[in-house]
């Protein structure tokens, strides 16, 4: 059963003060509670770092790591190197998660007995609706390497 496994939620942060609090609130309110939130500040020049520090002070699941600006890939890699979870979820700093997103992903892993799950998204800001698939036929079956390549 996957329900007791730690998920590392990695959030690259770079000059996103406008969106960041809504993103972090949505992570903090997840129904799946066994998470660590790895915030990697990639040399922000706005108040993004201060916002991250505020969340780290009020919730010990949040951890902040700072680096000079290296770009998104290096920032995600840094987050992975700092993570302790058995599972990893990447969340962009302008994303807002449904409150049960992580729980649903873990549930799907358990039901389907797979190593990797992905979800789609809904873009509320531009009225472009791309809902998550509910049809299990869409689920990729194969080994982890093939699944990663298909993403």
Per-region residue spans from a language model:
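Nucleotide-sugar donor-binding/catalytic module of glycosyltransferases
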Residues: 1-151
């Amino acid at each position: 059963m996957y329900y007791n496994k730690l998920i590392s939620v990695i959030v690259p942060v770079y000059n996103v003060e406008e969106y960041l609090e809504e993103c972090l609130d949505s992570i903090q309110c997840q129904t799946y509670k066994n998470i660590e939130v790895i915030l990697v500040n990639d040399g922000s020049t706005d108040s993004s770092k201060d916002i991250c520090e505020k969340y780290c002070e009020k919730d010990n699941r949040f951890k902040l790591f700072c680096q000079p600006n290296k770009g998104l890939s290096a920032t995600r890699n840094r987050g992975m190197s700092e993570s302790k979870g058995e599972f990893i979820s990447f969340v962009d700093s302008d994303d807002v998660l449904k409150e049960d997103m992580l729980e649903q992903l873990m549930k799907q892993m358990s039901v389907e007995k797979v190593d990797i799950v992905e979800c789609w998204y809904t873009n509320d800001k531009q009225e472009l609706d791309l809902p998550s698939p509910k049809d299990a036929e869409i689920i990729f079956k194969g080994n982890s390497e093939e699944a990663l390549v298909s993403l």
